[in-house]
């Protein structure tokens, strides 16, 4: 066992040869490297698989013995200061290693096909491997200095991948937004690290916690200063994990390739903030009010993320706000002291959200065969619908991910979210009400995304690709579907109802292609050439993705089905997660053995499932396929006859829609007051620098120039000039003498 831990230092460096070799290959042998580019995906998967096997071995040993291993190398700069570098293997590290490697491998396999026709294929895999290296280094760090170094490397990789298609102005702007927003949090993190070093004199976690606890117990610290330093540390996690108010970068980060969205949202960048707070829990729990502040930020993010997801039309942005809300649940659990529940939800959410993002990538991939490469169209749920027949495997996997996130048993997120909801009641009734209400909102917006994407008819056939309407009946329902007031006499309602029964080509058959224009592709392929933005070749119907993309989705289905059983709290003997985290930090249940009886569990589960079911019912009520509503005209007429009540209902609905679709006006507020204010300040500083600061030396130079010109004209060699200036000076001196002696 000791030997296994001794070689754990190699874990972060195993994926590193891939970006280094790709860079050397492009520099020395560019043609050969590009022609053999597909082999780099195999090497990336192979190296990360080795890390996964190593991590599983460490995790098994952690479960059996709860052994904490730390190794440190000391670099002595002088007698008073030294830097220590090392690695720390404990239950938290082993959990994160498993998460990063398993999700990372699935994303890499998926990306091999998804990015196969992209000119940036090599660059993508170089970034991804370096991303894995940075995240693995972060979770194995033994001190705050290493944490900060790898923290910045994780951020750099995220910015590179968010702005991967940097020739698109929207992607470049999203990259810049993520960078600027995270700069705020990272600066706070750096100040917090320096503050605690000034207090304790150490960066090492073990020494830092021990010294700080002694100072707190002896009342030898300034609590105001300590609280400020703790908030600054937490600011880094706020930005990285997209917590309010530094959450604005996360939806725009969807401009990157879909595989990287899956990795960022499941196991890397946003998980880094949760990991940091979990790692520093022994520090935070002894500081008054800081845990309350963490839970407050968490509950605000929970509710805000859920409300902003209600009316999004972009499928990836809807999932992004879902991630924001679920991260809020994790932060809420950490703030309440439910260490185990937070990490449990981090695990279950990672696999469910990776499944949803890879499923959305499959949907986007299929929609690109209809509308060409244009994210505003291929990711727009307005143009989707009716994909159940064409993408059955993707549909079933997306449904499982949706139900898991809704909290439906026995799927993964049910077990973890239920613990957080129960703990929220013990912590604060107000927080409990908000958390339980948000669980219903989660079920609503996730079911909405599923219904708009897979149920009903393929709405791209109801309007052209430029967005111009050619029929008034392309709207499924409110929120996400525009209605049309233009009447079309040639359109028959009976025709619309019969469209459901018309046969459509199956994705299993490639013998026939149904053209919708003359630019149909000559060869059916499961991927597009991303760099060809002008490509207008389309098919009439989407089809299922290639097996290389479906394989990771199927594996993630297994994780979504069974990973929740790791933390079932019925019996201590089968509760693997509690053994893994023993001794865990749980302020709400300090004397608990993390096991509950059947009656208590059934009561709480019934309540949570009822709320989730209510949200699902409302979503089905509002977003069921359009033809089912048309077939029940009497049901529709009841809403028409509502009169004034309907007007009031529409006002409420539109207000909620505007709030959600406009991102709670938070981005607009930042743009108008912060961004505009900073730009005005920058313009004023520019004006002051150029017109005042620069004007002083420039004015002296001009005065010297004109003075020299005058002197030069005097000494021009003409006697008349000499006489003129001579008599002028004599006259001036005489006048001065006269006035002073009068």
Curated annotation (Swiss-Prot):
Name of this chain's protein: NAD(P)H-quinone oxidoreductase subunit 5, chloroplastic
Lineage: Eukaryota, Viridiplantae, Streptophyta, Embryophyta, Tracheophyta
Catalyzed chemical reaction(s): a plastoquinone + NADH + (n+1) H(+)(in) = a plastoquinol + NAD(+) + n H(+)(out); a plastoquinone + NADPH + (n+1) H(+)(in) = a plastoquinol + NADP(+) + n H(+)(out)
Location relative to the cell: Plastid, Chloroplast thylakoid membrane
Key words of the record: Chloroplast, Membrane, NAD, NADP, Plastid, Plastoquinone, Quinone, Thylakoid, Translocase, Transmembrane, Transmembrane helix, Transport
Organism listed in the record: Lactuca sativa
Keyword Plastid part of the UniProt annotation: yes
GO cellular component term, pick one: chloroplast thylakoid membrane
InterPro entries in alphabetical order: NADH_UbQ_OxRdtase_chlpt_su5_C, NADHpl_OxRdtase_5_subgr, ND/Mrp_TM, NU5C-like, Proton_antipo_N
GO terms assigned for molecular function: NADH dehydrogenase (ubiquinone) activity; quinone binding
Source taxon at top rank: Eukaryota
GO biological process: ATP synthesis coupled electron transport
Its membrane topology: Multi-pass membrane protein
Annotated transmembrane regions: 9-29, 40-60, 89-109, 125-145, 147-167, 185-205, 219-239, 258-278, 283-303, 327-347, 354-374, 396-416, 425-445, 550-570, 606-626, 722-742
Enzyme Commission code: 7.1.1.-
Family: Belongs to the complex I subunit 5 family.
Function summary: NDH shuttles electrons from NAD(P)H:plastoquinone, via FMN and iron-sulfur (Fe-S) centers, to quinones in the photosynthetic chain and possibly in a chloroplast respiratory chain. The immediate electron acceptor for the enzyme in this species is believed to be plastoquinone. Couples the redox reaction to proton translocation, and thus conserves the redox energy in a proton gradient.
Subunit structure: NDH is composed of at least 16 different subunits, 5 of which are encoded in the nucleus.
């Amino acid at each position: 066992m000791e030997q296994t831990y001794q070689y754990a230092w190699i874990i972060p460096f195993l994926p590193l040869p891939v970006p280094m070799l790709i860079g050397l290959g492009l520099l020395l042998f560019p043609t050969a490297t590009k022609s053999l580019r597909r082999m780099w995906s195999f090497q990336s998967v192979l190296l990360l698989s080795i890390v996964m096997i190593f991590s599983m071995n460490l995790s098994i040993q952690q479960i059996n013995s709860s052994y904490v291993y730390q190794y440190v190398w000391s670099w002595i700069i002088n007698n008073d200061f030294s830097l220590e570098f090392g690695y720390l293997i404990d239950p938290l590290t082993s959990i994160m290693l498993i998460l990063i490697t398993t999700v990372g491998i699935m994303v890499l396999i998926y990306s091999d096909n998804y990015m196969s026709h992209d000119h940036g294929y090599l660059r993508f895999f170089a970034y991804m491997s370096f991303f894995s290296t940075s995240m693995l280094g972060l979770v194995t760090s033994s001190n705050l200095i290493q944490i900060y170094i790898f923290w910045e490397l994780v951020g750099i990789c995220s910015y590179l991948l968010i702005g991967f298609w940097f020739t698109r102005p929207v992607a470049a702007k999203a990259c810049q937004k993520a960078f600027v927003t995270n700069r705020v949090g990272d600066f706070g993190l750096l100040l917090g690290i320096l503050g605690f070093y000034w207090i304790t004199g150490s960066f090492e976690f073990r020494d830092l916690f021990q010294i700080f606890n002694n100072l707190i117990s002896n009342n030898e610290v300034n609590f105001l200063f300590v609280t400020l330093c703790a908030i600054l540390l937490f600011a880094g996690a706020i930005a990285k994990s997209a917590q309010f108010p530094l959450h604005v970068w996360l939806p725009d980060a969807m401009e990157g390739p879909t595989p990287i969205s899956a990795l960022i949202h499941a196991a890397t960048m946003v998980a880094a903030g949760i990991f940091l707070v979990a790692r520093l829990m022994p520090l935070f729990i002894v500081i008054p009010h800081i845990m309350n502040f963490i839970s407050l930020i968490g509950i605000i993010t929970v509710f805000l993320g859920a409300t902003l997801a209600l009316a999004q039309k972009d499928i990836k942005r809807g999932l992004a706000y879902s991630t924001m809300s679920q991260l809020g649940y994790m932060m809420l659990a950490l703030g309440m002291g439910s260490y185990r529940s937070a990490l449990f939800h981090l695990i279950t959410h990672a696999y469910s959200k990776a499944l949803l993002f890879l499923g959305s990538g499959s949907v986007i991939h299929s929609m690109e065969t209809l509308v060409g490469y244009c994210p505003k169209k291929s990711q727009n749920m307005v143009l989707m619908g009716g994909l159940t027949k064409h993408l059955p495997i993707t549909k079933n996997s997306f449904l499982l991910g949706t139900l898991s996130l809704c909290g439906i048993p026995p799927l993964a997120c049910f077990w973890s979210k239920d613990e957080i909801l129960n703990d929220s009641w013990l912590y604060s009734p107000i927080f409990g009400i908000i958390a339980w209400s948000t669980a219903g909102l989660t079920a609503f917006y996730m079911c909405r995304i599923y219904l708009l994407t897979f149920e009903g008819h393929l709405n791209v056939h109801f309007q052209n690709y430029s967005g111009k309407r050619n029929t008034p009946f392309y709207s499924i329902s409110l929120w996400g579907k525009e209605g049309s007031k233009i009447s079309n006499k040639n359109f028959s309602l009976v025709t619309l109802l019969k469209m459901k029964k018309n046969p459509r080509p199956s994705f299993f058959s490639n013998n026939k292609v149904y053209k919708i224009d003359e630019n149909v592709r000559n060869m059916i392929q499961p991927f597009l050439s991303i760099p060809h933005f002008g490509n207008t070749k389309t098919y009439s119907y989407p089809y299922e993705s290639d097996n290389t993309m479906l394989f990771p989705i199927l594996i993630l289905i297994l994780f979504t089905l069974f990973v929740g059983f790791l933390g079932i709290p019925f019996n201590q003997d089968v509760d693997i997660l509690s053994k893994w985290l023993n001794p865990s930090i749980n302020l709400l249940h300090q004397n608990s053995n993390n096991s509950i009886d059947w009656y208590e569990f059934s009561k709480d589960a019934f309540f949570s499932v009822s709320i989730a079911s209510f949200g699902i019912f409302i979503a089905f009520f509002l977003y069921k396929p359009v033809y089912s509503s048309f077939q029940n005209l009497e049901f529709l007429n009841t809403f028409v006859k509502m009169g004034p009540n309907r007007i009031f209902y529409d006002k409420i609905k539109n207000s909620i829609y505007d709030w959600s679709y406009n991102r709670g006006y938070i981005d607009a507020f930042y743009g108008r007051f912060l961004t505009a204010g900073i730009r005005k300040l920058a313009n004023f500083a520019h004006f002051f620098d150029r017109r005042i600061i620069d004007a002083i030396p420039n004015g002296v130079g001009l005065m010297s120039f004109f003075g020299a010109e005058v002197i030069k004209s005097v000494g021009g060699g003409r006697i008349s000039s000499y006489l003129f200036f001579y008599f002028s000076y004599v006259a001036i001196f005489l006048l001065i003498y006269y006035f002073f002696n009068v």
